[in-house]
Amino acid sequence: KGGDEIRYPASITKIMTLLLAVENCSLKEDVVFTETGTRDISWDSGNIGMQVGEVMSMRACLYALVIRSANEVAAQIAEHVGGTEQHFVDMMNERAAQIGCTNTHFVNASGLPDPDHYSTAHDMALIMREGLKNKKFRRIIGATDYTIKPTNMNSEPRVLHTHHPMLAPESSYHYDGCIGGKTGYTSEAGNTLVTAAEKNGTTYITVTMKAADLAVASTDSTALFNYGYQNFTKAQVNGGEVSVPNGVTVDNLTVQENSQNGNTVDDYYYNDYLLGSVEVPEATPTPEPAVDALSDTSGGNTDQADQNEKADTVG
């Protein structure tokens, strides 16, 4: 309902900030806090009290970004990854367009209020879906707890615990199968909530915006999840799967082909309602006959990126 209505996203903006960070840097990098980050610290704004000159790992920054919704950390991540905040914002908007967002425009990395900072429930779901393809993103967006070790300017650990009602185990709104999400709130945006759940191999994403409170947002999200799992099944299509209403077959769907980020994507519709999108696999070229297979000694090489990824695990 109202999936394409333009609204203020508040802190669910940080989903895009997280995605760009895990795509563009190592979690082991040190982030040095400058006035860029610390200027966004205020009593009524989510923060962890960072100071100018304080150093923290990118991993710790990202957990603070998601779990505590720390705005000064969002600003510092933007400067660290993009060189400048403005360049990072440009990266956010470019990545949103690549993902397929058509009604989104960011002006900061945190979601603090600005008339020109907006999105839609549909676009935020697309960003979340893209993020869930990344293992680091999934691990961080689904964390319920994290302890930041003492830093060069803070002798005490900072203990973080999620305030996402559907993710927190102790919450009365906890949803069995919830794998992560992000909360948001400003007086202009109301309460915003992005949530992902996975059951029986099927993942659904819900987005609520401008809710009266998190209880309403969580209740609505739970109703959406229950409806999806009770009334939809997976159907095999070219290159993947889409969820279709019970009793509907692939023959009942219409397909619209488009290009996304240089790849061909098929959008599947039922009664003019978009059910899902699947990237069309490229045709496998016919291999050329081997001239001298025994002379190929490259098989023992290991991709350095794979080595880096394996080494970059949560400590």
Where are these regions (language model features)?
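Domain-terminus/edge residues, biased toward the C-terminal soluble/receptor-binding domains
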Residues: 101-102, 113-315
